[in-house]
A protein has these predicted regions:
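Conserved alpha/beta enzyme-core scaffold
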Residues: 3-467
Length: 467
């Protein structure tokens, strides 16, 4: 039924007159070639009967963008990597979920991926040298496309079906995908009724697509993950000590941000302005805790760049004008973040040294994730009137090692400098570092380390004359 509807839509668009046809010509001095939400009169995509047909026009040497996180179009990636005739294909994306056949050992030599942020499906490929990692602030990724620093020939997207006027949406993942849709010469999309229709910067007109594949494939969903006792304790500390009524929250990905959300049920008039949102916001909205009453940007609404969670989260987003899904260059703009009074930024870390340097993207030399938006929000929250910047982590790693260290591991990537860091939280309390000396920082950090590690940390710090 949906295929018939899409084919009918394509035929209708081809019959449309040529009045006010938006141009695909590049904007002056930029790599932008289209406004994705503008209708192209007389144009319509090719309706592909299979994923193989949808990507059949992609040539060797093509530079391909892959839609982010929950929207990763696995069917198209699988079809692309089945193309034994292709060589020298370069793929670019941030974190994607699901299978990553383009980074498998079998694809090496024909496909090379530039990861602007890593998910679990990319770590082995980067560690083994089959794929690359680019350290970059998430806020700056759209400009890499728009300035032509990372040219794109094709964007592989997953979008919602067109409405009566031909408008599809980027659903739960506007983030860097809008910029890619503006700049890629060709747009290929999986069109699925499982994609929520969202508001904000999400619109892509059906006529801007070059090829479409009808599919009922659901968006990738986050697997359930039980929070540890340490995660829950950290959530309580942050909620009770650092989040006031009327605050606006930014929360990163992971167990700790979700634990924080669970501990906010008694707060009032909170707002959400965040690069990402997860299931935890739903209950707070339904309980009337999140109202956005004090937000400057999109008052009364949630602002986010992407969403990743359960099917319930995607259903919550569908046709929900209370959520504005925005370009990540907008959401993560430091000046815009700073303009929101009472902005509380909560991000996690892999390891922090006793001076406050945050490693959040690697385990030693092994890349684990990426820079992302932590620094964007850390700085923005610090500049916000009444803002609070929080870096949170359990005191111990899974192997029992201290995650608060005297010196970061060799090769560790410093994502957030010690000058940026304001508050560090473990299950043992809060270390307020802003304006404090190295000696004072060392004492504060050791005080929130695991009790079994404090003597060891103190001795090592004294040996280095940090105490």
């Amino acid at each position: 039924m949906m295929r018939a509807t899409i084919c009918g839509r394509a035929a209708a668009l081809r019959r449309a007159s040529a009045r006010s046809a938006p141009s695909r010509q590049a904007h002056a001095d930029t790599a932008v070639v289209r406004e994705p939400s503008a209708a192209r009169a007389g144009a319509a995509p090719r309706a592909a009967a299979s994923a193989d047909e949808a990507v059949a026009h992609i040539a060797s040497g093509a530079r391909v963008f892959v839609h982010s996180v929950a929207h990763a179009p696995t069917q198209l990636l699988e079809a692309l990597t089945r193309r034994s005739d292709l060589t020298g294909v370069s793929l670019t994306h941030i974190h994607t979920e699901g299978a990553a056949p383009h980074m498998a050992a079998a694809a090496a030599g024909r496909f090379r991926t530039r990861n602007l942020f890593l998910g679990a499906n990319a770590r082995a490929a980067v560690a083994e040298g089959r794929a690359d990692f680019v350290p970059v602030f998430l806020s700056e990724v759209p400009s890499l496309f728009r300035r032509g620093a990372l040219p794109l020939d094709v964007a592989l997207l997953t979008v919602s079906p067109p409405d009566a006027r031909g408008f599809c949406t980027l659903g739960a993942s506007v983030d860097v995908a809008r910029a890619a849709a503006q700049c890629a010469a060709s747009l290929v999309a999986v069109v699925s009724p499982r994609v929520p229709r969202t508001f904000g910067d999400s619109l892509v007109h059906f006529s801007q697509l070059d090829a479409v594949l009808e599919s009922d494939t659901p968006l990738h969903a986050a697997p359930p993950r039980a929070a540890s006792a340490a995660d829950e304790a950290i959530g309580r500390i942050i909620a009770q000590e650092l989040v006031r009524d009327g605050a606006t929250l930014q929360l990163g990905i992971g167990a700790i941000p979700n634990a924080v959300l669970r501990c906010l049920a008694s707060h009032k008039d909170l707002g959400i302005y965040s690069e990402m949102i997860s299931d935890g916001v739903i209950e707070l909205v339904e309980r009337g805790v999140v109202t956005g009453a004090h937000k400057v940007e999109h008052p009364g609404r949630i602002t986010a760049g992407f969403a990743y969670g359960s099917p319930r989260l995607y259903a919550f987003l569908h046709d929900n004008a209370g959520v504005a899904m925005k370009d990540i260059a907008f959401v993560n703009n430091v000046a815009r973040i700073a303009s929101q009074p009472g902005l509380v930024s909560i991000n996690s870390a892999l390891e922090i040294d006793i001076s406050g340097q945050v490693c959040a993207d690697s385990l030693g030399h092994t890349v684990f994730s990426g820079v992302g938006g932590a620094v964007d929000f850390c700085r923005g929250a610090a500049l916000s009137r009444g803002g609070v910047s929080v870096t949170a982590l359990p005191s111990l790693a899974r192997n029992g090692a201290s995650r608060i260290v005297v010196e970061l591991a060799p090769g560790a990537g410093v994502v957030t400098t010690r000058a940026h860091v304001r508050h560090v939280v473990t299950e043992f309390g809060v270390a307020a570092l802003h304006g404090r000396s190295l000696n004072e920082r060392a004492r504060a950090m050791i005080a929130i380390a695991h009790p079994s590690k404090r003597d060891e940390l103190t001795a090592a710090a004294r040996k280095l004359r940090l105490l």
